Amino acid sequence: MSRYLFTSESVSEGHPDKIADQISDAVLDEILKQDPKARVACETYVKTGMALVGGEITTSAWVDIENLTRQVICDIGYKHSDMGFDGHSCAVLNAIGKQSSDINQGVDRENPLDQGAGDQGIMFGYATNETEVLMPAAITYAHRLMERQAKVRKEGTLPWLRPDAKSQVTLKYEDHKIVGVDAVVLSTQHCDSISQHDLHEAVMEEIIKPVLPAEWLSKETKYFINPTGRFVIGGPMGDCGLTGRKIIVDTYGGAARHGGGAFSGKDPSKVDRSAAYAARYVAKNIVAAGLADRCEIQLSYAIGVADPTSIMVETFGTGKVANELLVALVREFFDLRPYGLIKMLDLIQPIYRETAAYGHFGREQFPWEKVDRAEELRAAAGLK
């Protein structure tokens, strides 16, 4: 029997890196509302008392960067100096320039179908049938813990909570099946007045127990709740935040490979983002079709070239048909050229701020989570 542990982590919307991601994607959304053809690469840096928004943007749109940045920070919950960061009073610096004309000539084409990739690179997509959303369980539940922390904080159930938090879930496997939770780590920023005893009890009862399946918890499960004993200083006052530093949290929690490209602040012409979404869409449809229990897709692109330079399918011994057939089906049923995948997934819409916390995958509101190709894939593979 094969026994092992696997762990994934998540961070809250108030984590400094996630503040930066949300600001970058809020800028992208506001631009796409006005200018669907915009080219956006927006990066954000946050630290005590300041937010710096920079990058390369070519657009006909006008966005009030300062007010938008302040609104995002306040929406997250940083709206009073007591928290060490205040969206109303922090400095907002704007260092945005235009996208290089050298890149433009490689991407833009007279025929939209010939639109080239915005850069070279490799992208991975993954799906597994171990959860109902066809995502790895550890990252799924780590995200749900963070969503629950935000919910009880914002609704006032636990009014002493503050926006910055992290979670980590370690699952026990036997023969690749989950048999329980080995350990849970949950660290949450809090106000100075709450006792550690009350914090531990409240986090356990209001955050952990409502989220994790009861049948996975046992007397052997270990809980590490604010293990340093104090977490009052947090957010950008505790650590600086940068766009694109939580790429494993954003994807599969380490259960699949990653091409290295971050998502937030990038318009869909950047295949770092759009092709990673397409790869998830392909992998999820293969698993939903019952063609494999686990599936990983690798795509690669060359700057200025429309067609992928490679497509790889790996099913880790769980495939019901040969991987070579799956590659052929991917080529037949999915248009993975930049223009094709943007159209296939309807990516030119202002949906990106919502992706910037709690994971880009496994959330049914996003178009790359559809399984609308599953039946035709199964039929084409010859499975009844």
From Swiss-Prot:
It is found in: Cytoplasm. One of its GO terms (cellular component) is cytoplasm. L-methionine binds at E56, Q99, D239, K270. Pathway: Amino-acid biosynthesis; S-adenosyl-L-methionine biosynthesis; S-adenosyl-L-methionine from L-methionine: step 1/1. Coiled coil: none annotated. ATP binds at H15, D164, A165, K166, R230, F231, D239, R245, K246, A262, K266. PANTHER family: S-ADENOSYLMETHIONINE SYNTHETASE. This is S-adenosylmethionine synthase.
